[in-house]
Design a protein with these regions (language model features):
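Acidic/polar low-complexity flexible segments
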Residues: 28-50, 55, 113-274, 301, ...
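Bacterial N-terminal signal peptides that target proteins for export
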Residues: 1-12
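N-terminal onset of structured domains
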Residues: 79-95, 100, 106
Length: 360
């Protein structure tokens, strides 16, 4: 009898292992969330994309990103795998993050205008069949936080609200995009921290957004994805009334800012340029209001991006409770995910599962 029981047990274990190999989702369900510990800072943190001594106190979590949501039909030259090293500190008012990841190229050429030999202007674009660009765009990073209880987030992380379009349909609606973001039922919201190296990075901020259950493109063109409440600022495509050239430029010209128009340099476009010259494709202005809650300093050097991030532990004001994760309970575990966009509009590398952050 004992031998028979042992045989049955062994067979059961073998079959379970075979099922997990055949069905990765089953294996993933057994995977526990990764863990990040935010440690109390002893000294003030200065946002400068450099690790001052205070960061020595925090232990880095390494998160491997090796999943892609889709293959663009016109090619993809971006990274297919990278590892994000992340640390966290906090003080009485703020939570901080220090992130580093390898990216061999600094991608800033987001839809720039190029002067042609015949005197006309052409905006560089190479969109794929989904209407998105993977050639003339920008580097980005996303942090995706569960605000309230989102079913499946702890196990699946970001993937629980990323819905791919299949056979031209998304949630029964005709759609050409590769996928859409939305939660699966009313009341579920996710805080989306989106760093954009061209549109927000030069201004020292993330684009603070959130995701809810909206699936009607008539109600919101970006489906469940929304910007937080703002009182001003933002970014806007730089083209004239008939879209044949830029409307604004930097004056004086700035090589450092050649791919974006800054508020303090913004001037009406005057064409004194020669063939091959570049004018930015985007005009950027700092967000005011909750959409600008997250501060950052970023730097690319020797094939690596470094971001030093700061946000209030708790936010207040209009709709803060449904648009922002609130780090108000130091005994709670906060679940999130990370993704990296290498010169891509929506294509990105991400990880399976979630990360659980606790405070110590």
């Amino acid at each position: 009898m004992k031998t028979a029981r042992k045989s049955i047990l062994v067979m059961g274990l073998v079959m379970t292992a075979m099922l997990m190999i055949a069905n990765p989702l089953l294996a993933e369900d057994k995977k526990a969330p990764m863990k990040l510990v935010s440690v109390k800072a002893d000294t003030a943190i200065t946002l400068d994309a450099m690790a001052e001594k205070a960061w020595d106190k925090a232990t880095a979590l390494e998160v491997k990103l090796d999943q892609l949501p889709y293959e663009p039909n016109n090619g993809y030259n971006g990274i297919r795998e990278t590892t994000v090293k992340i640390k966290s500190l906090y003080d009485d008012k703020y939570v901080y993050f220090y992130l580093q990841y390898a990216d061999p190229t600094q991608s800033l050429e987001r839809f720039p205008w190029i002067k042609q030999a015949d005197g006309s202007w052409k905006q560089s674009k190479k969109k794929d069949s989904t209407g998105h660009d993977n050639t003339y765009y920008e580097d980005k990073l996303g942090m995706y936080w569960e605000i309230n209880k989102v079913k499946g987030f702890k196990k699946k992380g970001c993937a629980v609200s990323c819905h791919l379009t299949e056979e031209g349909l998304n949630n029964g609606i005709a759609d050409t995009s590769a996928g859409r973001k939305y939660t699966n039922k009313p009341g579920e919201t996710i805080d989306m921290w989106h760093w954009k190296s061209v549109r927000t990075g030069p201004l020292g901020m993330f684009d603070d957004q959130f995701v809810d259950d909206v699936t009607d493109p008539k109600a919101n063109k970006n489906w469940g994805r929304h910007g937080d409440v703002k009182t001003g600022g933002g970014y806007k495509n730089n083209f004239n009334a008939d879209k044949t050239g830029p409307a604004f430029m930097n004056s004086p010209y700035s090589e450092k800012d050649k791919y974006w128009v800054l508020p303090e340099l913004k001037a009406k476009f005057v064409d004194t340029f020669k063939a091959g010259d570049v004018v930015p494709g985007i005009v950027i202005t700092p967000f005011t209001g909750h959409r600008g809650d997250i501060k950052v300093q970023s730097a690319w050097k020797d094939g690596q991006w470094t971001l030093e991030v700061k946000r209030a532990l708790a936010t207040t004001g209009d709709k803060a409770e449904i648009q922002d994760v609130q780090f108000s309970d130091m005994a709670k575990t906060y679940y999130f995910g990370i993704s990296v966009f290498d010169n891509s509009q929506i294509n990105h590398v991400y990880h399976e599962g979630s990360i659980g952050m606790t405070f110590k």
